[in-house]
Each structure stands twice: as structure tokens, then as C-alpha cells.
């Protein structure tokens, strides 16, 4: 059963990544990067919160929103996301998780609601903590590893110098897609961003 947002409750936009400077430029931290960009756009400051996430209360597309970056490692993201959702009384239908996606080419953004975790430990942790997979995802394409490189190593490496030149546009598209999801809903946002690459 598909759940659609109702009323005027807040949105929770949770970007996934690993905390600390060691991981800051990693592909796996694309979700953090998008949330940081949204905070910058709205003049918001992420602050430590008892949910074990850095959070900022703000407005996106005219709606109340909470930006969050879990302070746990990726595979334990579910606890902080569930705690923030509970604290701010956010419906599952208003939860947007922003994460890196291996199976999408670098530079592309894809949106969906629900589905499997596709081997992504952060999504697996969130689905387990929430008891549902029926939340919105903004999937930031990082592409597949070259040759026989282990995907686990690939996601924990920094973007290449070539990718870094194109990264700002990718992050802009991902941040824009979050705002369009909130303003217009899933299908219009998919139609817009799935056509770009």
C-alpha cells in the first residue's frame, strides 16, 4: 500500500554518510553533502541533537523541514533516523533519505518510494529501525567501481579529480530534487530528474 503525505506536518530529510573528517570526501558521504548544501541554501546550521544526529530545523519549498546527518556510522544509521523521526513527529510518508547509489551512473539522480536496500547498509539499518521500507529515497549516482575493485572499497574512496569537477552540479540536482519532492510530489520530481541523464 502506498502512503502519501497528509496534513502539514514537518518533513525529515536525512542524508547518509560516515561521520568525521576521514570520510568527508568519500562517495559514501554523498547524502551528507546534499544535506550540507540544503543547510547552506537555507542559512541553517546543523547542531548536535539527542537523536544522535546533527539536525537543523528549517523550511524547504515553503514547508517545515528538519535536516539530519546521523552521527553513527553508515550501518547504524537507523537508530538516529528513527529517533529524529520520533522526536519531530514525522510521518514515514514525509521522510526523505538521501544516499549514494552504485547502480546509478555518476551524475544522475533517481527518486523512489520503498523497495529493497540493494546492498546499502544504511538503508537496511533504517528499514529495520522503522519497521518499513516505505519512505522516499533520493539516490545520488556514484557509478560502479572500475575493474574488479570491491564495491565496499570503492564507496569509501574519495571522488576522483574529474568527478570532483562535476560533483557540485550533481549535488545541486539532488538538493533541487528534494525540494521538488516536497513541493510537487514524487511523480513530477521523477519526471523532471529522471530525464536529465
Curated annotation (Swiss-Prot):
<feature type="site" description="Stabilizes the basic form of H active site to accept a proton">
    <location>
        <position position="100"/>
    </location>
</feature>
<keyword id="KW-0378">Hydrolase</keyword>
<dbReference type="GO" id="GO:0000049">
    <property type="term" value="F:tRNA binding"/>
</dbReference>
<keyword id="KW-0963">Cytoplasm</keyword>
<comment type="subunit">
    <text>Monomer.</text>
</comment>
<feature type="binding site">
    <location>
        <position position="73"/>
    </location>
    <ligand>
        <name>tRNA</name>
    </ligand>
</feature>
<keyword id="KW-0820">tRNA-binding</keyword>
<feature type="binding site">
    <location>
        <position position="23"/>
    </location>
    <ligand>
        <name>tRNA</name>
    </ligand>
</feature>
<dbReference type="GO" id="GO:0004045">
    <property type="term" value="F:peptidyl-tRNA hydrolase activity"/>
</dbReference>
<comment type="function">
    <text>Hydrolyzes ribosome-free peptidyl-tRNAs (with 1 or more amino acids incorporated), which drop off the ribosome during protein synthesis, or as a result of ribosome stalling.</text>
</comment>
<feature type="binding site">
    <location>
        <position position="121"/>
    </location>
    <ligand>
        <name>tRNA</name>
    </ligand>
</feature>
<dbReference type="InterPro" id="IPR036416">
    <property type="entry name" value="Pept_tRNA_hydro_sf"/>
</dbReference>
<dbReference type="GO" id="GO:0006515">
    <property type="term" value="P:protein quality control for misfolded or incompletely synthesized proteins"/>
</dbReference>
<comment type="function">
    <text>Catalyzes the release of premature peptidyl moieties from peptidyl-tRNA molecules trapped in stalled 50S ribosomal subunits, and thus maintains levels of free tRNAs and 50S ribosomes.</text>
</comment>
<protein>
    <recommendedName>
        <fullName>Peptidyl-tRNA hydrolase</fullName>
        <ecNumber>3.1.1.29</ecNumber>
    </recommendedName>
</protein>
<comment type="similarity">
    <text>Belongs to the PTH family.</text>
</comment>
<feature type="binding site">
    <location>
        <position position="75"/>
    </location>
    <ligand>
        <name>tRNA</name>
    </ligand>
</feature>
<feature type="active site" description="Proton acceptor">
    <location>
        <position position="28"/>
    </location>
</feature>
<dbReference type="Pfam" id="PF01195">
    <property type="entry name" value="Pept_tRNA_hydro"/>
</dbReference>
<keyword id="KW-0694">RNA-binding</keyword>
<dbReference type="GO" id="GO:0005737">
    <property type="term" value="C:cytoplasm"/>
</dbReference>
<dbReference type="InterPro" id="IPR001328">
    <property type="entry name" value="Pept_tRNA_hydro"/>
</dbReference>
<feature type="site" description="Discriminates between blocked and unblocked aminoacyl-tRNA">
    <location>
        <position position="18"/>
    </location>
</feature>
<dbReference type="InterPro" id="IPR018171">
    <property type="entry name" value="Pept_tRNA_hydro_CS"/>
</dbReference>
<dbReference type="GO" id="GO:0072344">
    <property type="term" value="P:rescue of stalled ribosome"/>
</dbReference>
Amino acid at each position: 500500500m502506498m502512503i502519501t503525505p497528509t496534513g502539514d506536518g514537518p518533513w525529515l530529510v536525512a542524508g547518509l554518510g560516515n561521520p568525521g573528517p576521514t570520510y568527508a570526501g568519500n562517495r559514501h558521504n554523498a547524502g551528507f553533502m546534499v544535506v550540507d548544501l540544503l543547510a547552506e541554501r537555507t542559512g541553517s546550521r546543523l547542531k548536535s541533537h539527542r537523536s544522535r544526529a546533527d539536525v537543523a530545523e528549517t523550511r524547504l519549498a515553503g514547508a517545515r523541514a528538519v535536516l539530519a546527518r546521523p552521527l553513527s556510522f553508515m550501518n547504524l544509521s537507523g537508530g538516529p533516523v528513527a529517533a529524529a523521526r520520533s522526536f519531530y513527529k514525522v510521518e514515514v510518508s514525509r521522510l526523505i533519505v538521501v544516499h549514494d547509489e552504485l547502480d546509478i551512473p555518476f551524475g544522475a539522480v533517481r527518486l523512489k518510494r520503498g523497495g529493497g536496500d540493494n546492498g546499502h547498509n544504511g538503508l537496511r539499518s533504517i528499514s529495520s529501525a522503522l519497521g518499513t521500507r516505505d519512505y522516499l529515497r533520493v539516490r545520488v549516482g556514484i557509478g560502479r567501481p572500475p575493474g574488479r575493485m570491491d564495491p565496499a572499497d570503492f564507496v569509501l574512496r574519495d571522488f576522483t579529480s574529474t568527478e570532483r569537477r562535476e560533483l557540485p552540479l550533481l549535488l545541486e540536482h539532488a538538493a533541487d530534487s528534494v525540494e521538488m519532492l516536497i513541493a510537487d510530489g514524487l511523480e513530477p520530481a521523477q519526471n523532471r530528474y529522471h530525464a536529465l541523464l
